Amino acid sequence: MDLDRITRPLRLAKGSYQPESGMGCVMNAISYIGGDTQVTDFPATSARPLAAFVQLCNDLLAGPDGYLSSESSFLALELGWQTVGTAVVTDTVIHAWVGELLTSPAWGVVQYADNVAVEAIFDIADLHRALASGEMPPIAAWHSADCAARAVCATLAGAGVYAVRAAYQSTALVDTERCETLDAVTGNALRCHELATKSTGADRIVEVTRDAIRSWRRLAQLDHPSHIESASVDNALDT
């Protein structure tokens, strides 16, 4: 792939695309490649939570000048490409994925929590998993878990705050607008990971993002995407 060609219509950089700037994040590039009417941080073919994970990787991979190197650009594009085709999934997939977002041993936010916070997060994750498996936990159970997590959160600091916040905000997925709630849950989970791994630079966040994307695709039973194709990028960016 001739990554230098991206610098003509769009050079990968920290932040979001601004018209006429010639700069944008990797999800802006995916949006452009996919033919969205307007270049956006959340391409139509990509699940919003996964796009948010990749955006954070993009920003952490940027150099001191705000731009991504050719090597970092390729890594970011590979991650972004893995989100293509993930936008449309069932509520069952959403709940199962949130359960993993909270408590997966590899990438769940529970790893940054202690003691009663761990219990509060697992209680909520168990409700999501139950719902994903076809059970219908009573609203009272969701409310009780929400209240318990909020009480715990008031005693915490640092990454643990955002871990528990992601958990209790996710209880609203059962009876409110899914998009806005999922954005809030994902945002808190990302902030949790960012605070807990800030000493490792982008490496750990890239690893977590790969896990998050793999989890989503597995739960949705989506085919494993191929590697990003040079022709797809070159044709889409041909001006």
Say what each PLM segment does.
Residues 1-239:
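Short, glycine-biased loop/turn motifs at secondary-structure junctions and
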